[in-house]
A protein has these predicted regions:
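N-lobe entry segment of adenylate-forming
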Residues: 1-33, 37-52, 56, 80, ...
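Aromatic/hydrophobic pocket-lining residues that form the small-molecule binding cavity
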Residues: 42-45, 70, 97
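Short beta->alpha junction loops/turns
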Residues: 27, 38, 66-67, 89-90, ...
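Conserved ATP-dependent adenylate/AMP-binding module captured primarily in the ANL superfamily
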Residues: 91-123
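Short hydrophobic beta-strand segments
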Residues: 21, 60-62, 109
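Conserved AMP-binding/adenylate-forming
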Residues: 31-32, 47-91
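Aromatic/hydrophobic pocket-lining residues that form π-stacking "cages" and hydrophobic walls in ligand
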Residues: 9, 73, 119
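Hydrophobic helix-cap positions at the C-terminus of alpha-helices
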Residues: 12-13, 122-125
Length: 125
């Protein structure tokens, strides 16, 4: 039986609920987040995406630096039924970003606070 990314996440959540899944550097130390804690955040964000109108099969982009919320955001997209259209934070030109969003038929964009100005620069186009 083929497994989805959701299946591959759910399995260790069941088997190792209190084990560390993610580490994030805050200051000089790394803060652990368990599988259960990540699952709760993923479920909450996924439900929020659905409440905002994300439907199964909608194309959605995620523009974020590599960090825990990137992992949580991508999993939440999958739980909401969205299809992830990959973007690189290295897209410097607004027309490159716009091209990918338009040609990827992206309906929703999840973006980190530090990269928000890149998305805002093309909203009116």
């Amino acid at each position: 039986m083929k497994k989805t990314l959701v299946d591959l996440f759910e399995e260790p959540v069941r088997n190792y609920p209190n084990k560390t899944f993610l580490l994030e550097k805050t200051g000089k130390k790394f803060e652990p987040t368990t599988y259960t804690q990540v699952k709760e955040k993923v479920y909450q964000l996924g439900a929020g995406l659905q409440a905002l109108g994300v439907k199964k099969g909608d194309n959605m982009a995620l523009l974020s630096e590599g960090r825990n919320m990137w992992v949580i955001g991508e999993l939440a997209m999958f739980y909401a039924g969205a299809v992830n259209v990959p973007l690189s934070i290295k897209l410097e030109e607004s027309n490159d970003l716009m091209f990918r969003l338009v040609h990827g038929d992206v309906k929703f964009v999840m973006v980190s606070g530090t990269l928000l100005k890149k998305v805002r620069s093309i909203i009116d186009q």
